[in-house]
Amino acid sequence: MRDRISDFLEEKHGLSANSKQSYKYDLEQCLDIVGERISDTSLKIYQAQLANLKISAQKRKISGCNQFLYFLYHKGEMDSFDRLESAKQAEKKAEKPEILDLDSFWQGSDFPEGRLLALLILEMGLLPSEILALKVADINLDFQVLRIQKASQQRIVTIPTSLLSELEPLMGQTYLFERTGKAYSRQWAFRQLEAFVKEKGFPALSAQALREQFILRQIENKVDLYEIAKKSGLKTVLTLEKYR
């Protein structure tokens, strides 16, 4: 797929060198996340990654990616023309967030990994990438804390008592979520989470929306915004101001 970017750009006449470079950067970034096997699931993952960008940036990246996807479809390299949702459509879907009744998440499930992923996001505000990178060695159930490491930075997060029994059976592994000692991919996590929330009747509930539920619950409990930012790994409280 990546080697087809140059062919795609050659067919776009009248573009300046800077515009072509911008297209190339956006498409390479898209393929870094989507991978070589483009699917509806991988496109949803990429769409979620764009959600925090300005609408203008989203429109540019979505337009470029959709043009490239159509190019691949037109050349017979894709069976169907799968595309990203327009930024306007995504914006229209945005409504004022409210606290959802997610008590059913604590009940049994045919998707136990998806269930635990959802609970870790909902109860602790962790990102899926942080959860997948989490090693058992970074979890201390006795002190009810876990350590999140990102590059040279780390933060200590308190584990709610309600999650201790969920984590205890996994303490003999290397990673919290693993297969033969290797951490699972983001696409695996996305599929597990998607299957679980569908099972519970919340098909539109993404990892980002679950993290938002964590924030809303913290605010409901009168937790200071700076403390919420610290728990969530946010550098500032600016993104939390809208929830006041």
From Swiss-Prot:
Q: Where is the active site?
A: K150, R211, Y243
Q: Which InterPro entries does the entry mention?
A: CB, DNA_brk_join_enz, Integrase-like_cat_sf, Integrase_catalytic, Integrase_recombinase_N, Tyrosine_recombinase_XerD-like
Q: Where in the cell is it found?
A: Cytoplasm
Listed A to Z, the keywords are: Cytoplasm, DNA integration, DNA recombination, DNA-binding
> Looking at the keywords, is Cytoplasm present?
yes
User: What family does the database annotate?
Assistant: Belongs to the 'phage' integrase family. XerD-like subfamily.
Q: What does this protein do?
A: Putative tyrosine recombinase. Not involved in the cutting and rejoining of the recombining DNA molecules on dif(SL) site.
Q: Could you tell me what this protein is called?
A: Tyrosine recombinase XerD-like
Species: Streptococcus mitis
What gene is behind this protein?
Answer: xerD
